[in-house]
């Protein structure tokens, strides 16, 4: 839908950082189509899909996982919880809860001949955004500042932002969604693995979670395959080794978030005098935050 070659980071009306890179630092997709593509590919690979109403209970029976739903019990060797920030699997199998949940409102604004670049607008809640697609913009506002004292944003805040930026109140398909960002210390227990937002693996700087969701899902699956292929290999240990590296990365993002949202004026000048270009170039070249900061790839091994 769109490759973000040009990006704007706005700290105020007068303080804006404009960055660009030919490769583009991120690619915009239609989420429904993105999810549908991977779902269809998964089914093609042999996965069986079953729609259920509600999971009532998840239990460990010896070395198996028992899942009770719709009056039935399903037994499996491993359970992967990929059910988002409000994960039922997480709630039924662990004491891991989000202390300061972050969330966002997002809607669609028609382009109508305009051509806004990808833009992040930082504010007292976290940031608002404009993400261009082919025929519309994804426009949203999120409370990325994870604090019990921070004010909850509302749909009214989104309407105010759209009105100020586009001079119109016309915004369609408004949705509200949570973002799982508190998995800095998450470790898999037994043979139940959480991935993506269910494990709190979205980064806390900008709230991006798709990359880590795909990556953690990939490693959870491959760790199970490796354990089936080698009796001496523990899927849990392999997945937790991956999580150790990934959560170190998340902790680095959290440090960055504290600087960005706690000291916006300093952040502006840091980005203006070199750090912004360093990040733009690094992300456009597919580097992690650790690699951008000069460290080796956390997934090199």
Task: Specify the residue positions occupied by each region the protein language model found.
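Conserved FAD-binding catalytic core of PHBH/FMO-like flavoproteins
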Residues: 85-152
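Structural motif
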Residues: 64, 73, 127, 136-138, ...
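FAD/FMN-dependent oxidoreductases across multiple families
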Residues: 57, 147-224, 228-229
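Conserved N-terminal helical subregion
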Residues: 2-92, 98-102
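C-terminal helical "tail/cap" subdomain of flavin- and related membrane-associated enzymes
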Residues: 222-301
């Amino acid at each position: 839908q769109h490759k973000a070659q040009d990006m704007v980071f706005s700290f105020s009306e007068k303080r804006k950082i404009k960055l660009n890179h030919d490769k583009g630092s991120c690619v915009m997709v239609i989420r429904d189509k993105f999810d549908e593509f991977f779902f269809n590919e998964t089914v093609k690979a042999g996965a069986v899909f079953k729609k259920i109403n509600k999971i009532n209970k998840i239990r460990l029976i010896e070395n198996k996982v028992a899942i009770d739903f719709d009056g039935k019990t399903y037994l499996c060797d491993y359970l992967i919880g990929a059910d988002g920030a409000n994960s039922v699997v997480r709630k039924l199998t662990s004491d891991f809860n989000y202390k300061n949940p972050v969330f966002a409102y997002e809607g669609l604004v028609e382009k109508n001949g305009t051509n806004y670049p990808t833009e992040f607008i930082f504010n007292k809640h976290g940031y608002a955004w404009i993400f261009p697609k082919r025929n519309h913009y994804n426009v949203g506002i999120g409370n990325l500042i994870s604090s019990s004292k921070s004010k909850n944003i509302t749909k009214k805040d989104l309407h105010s932002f759209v009105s100020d930026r586009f001079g119109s109140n016309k915004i369609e398909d408004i949705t509200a969604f949570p973002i799982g960002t508190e998995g800095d210390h998450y470790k898999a227990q037994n043979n139940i693995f959480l991935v993506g937002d269910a494990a709190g693996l979205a980064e806390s700087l900008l709230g991006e979670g798709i990359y880590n969701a795909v990556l953690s899902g990939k490693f959870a699956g491959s760790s199970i395959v490796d354990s089936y292929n080698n009796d001496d290999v523990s899927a849990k240990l392999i997945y937790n080794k991956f999580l150790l590296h990934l959560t170190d990365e998340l902790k680095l993002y959290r440090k960055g978030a504290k600087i960005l949202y706690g000291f916006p004026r300093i952040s502006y000048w840091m980005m203006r005098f070199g750090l912004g270009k360093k990040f733009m170039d690094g992300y456009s070249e597919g580097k992690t935050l650790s690699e951008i900061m000069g460290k080796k790839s956390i997934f090199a091994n």
